[in-house]
Amino acid sequence: MKKTIRITVLTALLLTLSLASAGTMAGAKTKNGFTYKITKNQVKIVSCSKNQKRIVIPNKIAGKKVTSLGANVWKKSSKVQTVVLPKYLKTIEKKQADYAWGNIVKKKNIFSTPFTGCGKLKNIKVAKGNKYFCSAKGVLYTKNKKTLLVYPAGRTQKSYTIQGKTTQIGEAAFEYAKYLQKISYGKKLFYISDGAFFASGLRSVELAKNISNVGLYAFAYSTKLQKVTLGDKVEQINTPFIGCTNLKQFQADKKEIGYYAVNDVLYYKDKKHI
């Protein structure tokens, strides 16, 4: 019987799925290009009209601590390359889109994040003293580096090595990273979240070592992806390769419990075609 993993998201207190309606802007104020709302003496940034290479989000606005970053802060930004997150930031929202099949085939991303529209973003930095997040050479992680949260889409390097402590890749973490061709990771990584590599530039993927769960549409529309290798720990994959039009080859470890490959076609062990 194929096993199913139930994962408790380690960053539930940090990454809130925003299901808010269009009424989000009600009661908002604007100062120095930042539109914000104050709730219980804490500031949430809901949008930013600044379109410049470097943007520093202030630690405080109107004397209140900036603790939250909304899912649509930059819907589209053609210039921003560096963002500095504030000292008191606790929450980075990700708005879950409609998973309906019609939206997926139209190549609509399944999450909106504060950085989704920042195609030239290369570095995310964190103000000194922040207790919840850290930056590893411009890539955003939780403070303990257990979860990789955001890999800036505008980085031009062809390969990236995930921190050795990291156990999971967050939702939409590598979305639109079109220059990225290869990803490497340590033995502790076991979970790849929904939409993690949506529309990325990856050429090949090795789901080996300790990876056991691959989220919904994790590699969707990575149109340059050609080869996928499954290791002996993979227990659950959730339609991760929709829109991968150049995917030609599947390989599965002979000892792998849940899947096997014949002539580059992936099957469940019960011989039902995936």
At which residue positions do the language-model features occur?
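Bacterial N-terminal signal peptides
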Residues: 11-20
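Acidic, Ser/Thr
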Residues: 48, 72-75
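Structural signature of tandem-repeat unit edges
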Residues: 33-41, 50-68, 78-94, 98-111, ...
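Conserved, function-critical positions that sit in or immediately flank catalytic
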Residues: 241
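Bacterial N-terminal signal peptides that target proteins for export
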Residues: 1-12
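Conserved functional micro-motifs across diverse proteins
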Residues: 44-45
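Sec-dependent signal peptide cleavage junction
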Residues: 19-32
